[in-house]
């Protein structure tokens, strides 16, 4: 057998061994809240199929030699599963959003910032919510800048399940104002005529988004943390974000 044939055979065997080793390791369980919308995550029939988080989480798992199992779940279910160690990684989360601490988890570096904005329609005559105004919001989400007005009844929450539903109801004139994140707003507007687009009034909050990783022996925690740093330094994180802007 020639030297070149031996080299090709060696490469094939190495690939097969790597694939076998990956198959023997348990899949990493990534939590995805069902309220997430594009461009962060595309969810079809209860399954995660694309978006920023899909690409990020798939790449993270690949870099540590694991498969990614993405679990689309209600927000409260995610919190409960994390408390019981049933989630390995959760991305698209900020420390300020968690009700209770998770001592068995470690935070990664932030991979982006989420900017929450107050939104209305392009043809609205007034650009500030009046007393008693209904505001489109996502069920279970907190909005610190508006919380006092919600608690006093000066503004009224109109909760729906997902980010894109908030904007769809605003466009359909079910209410005149809503809160969304800037990325989801831009995605919603991308194919609309100028007079049909929803417009940003003001930014009401900004939070760093990171991944929180279970720190147990069956999870390659440090390898995942290093992978995030490497993806940041190599420009992979920026490249993923750029695909959806």
Language-model regions, residue ranges each:
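Periplasmic-binding protein-like
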Residues: 34-36, 112-117, 190-229
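Short helices/loops that flank or line small-molecule/ion binding pockets
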Residues: 71, 76-88, 164-184, 191
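Extracytoplasmic small-molecule ligand-binding "clamshell" domains
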Residues: 24-101, 130, 137, 159-160, ...
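Short beta-strand-to-loop elements that line the ligand-binding cleft
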Residues: 67-74, 155-169, 201-202
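Ligand-binding clefts/hinges and TM-proximal coupling segments of bilobed small-molecule sensing domains
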Residues: 67-69, 145-161, 229-245
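Bacterial N-terminal signal peptides
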Residues: 8-18
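Flexible hinge/capping segments at coil-to-helix
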Residues: 115, 119-138
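A ligand-binding cleft/hinge motif common to bilobed small-molecule-binding domains
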Residues: 80, 92-102, 176-205
């Amino acid at each position: 057998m020639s030297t070149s044939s031996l080299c090709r055979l060696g490469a094939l065997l190495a690939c097969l061994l790597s694939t076998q080793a990956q198959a023997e390791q348990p899949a990493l369980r990534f939590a995805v809240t069902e309220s997430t919308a594009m461009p962060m995550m595309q969810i079809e029939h209860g399954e995660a199929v694309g978006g920023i988080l899909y690409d990020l989480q798939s790449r993270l798992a690949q870099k540590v030699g694991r498969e990614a199992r993405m679990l689309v779940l209600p927000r409260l279910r995610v919190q409960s599963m994390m408390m019981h160690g049933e989630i390995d990684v959760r991305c698209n989360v900020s420390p300020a959003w968690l009700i209770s601490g998770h001592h068995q988890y470690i935070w990664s570096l932030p991979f982006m910032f989420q900017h929450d904005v107050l939104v209305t329609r392009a043809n609205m005559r007034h650009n500030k919510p009046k007393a008693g105004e209904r505001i489109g919001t996502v069920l279970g989400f907190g909005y610190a800048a508006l919380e006092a007005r919600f608690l006093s009844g000066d503004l009224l929450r109109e909760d729906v399940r997902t980010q894109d539903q908030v904007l769809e109801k605003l466009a359909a004139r079910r209410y005149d104002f809503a809160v969304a994140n800037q990325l989801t707003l831009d995605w919603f507007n991308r194919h609309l005529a100028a007079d049909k687009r929803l417009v940003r009034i003001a930014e009401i909050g900004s939070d760093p988004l990171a991944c929180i990783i279970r720190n147990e022996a069956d999870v390659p925690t440090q390898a995942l943390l290093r992978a995030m740093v490497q993806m940041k330094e190599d420009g992979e994180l920026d490249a993923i974000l750029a695909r959806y802007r």
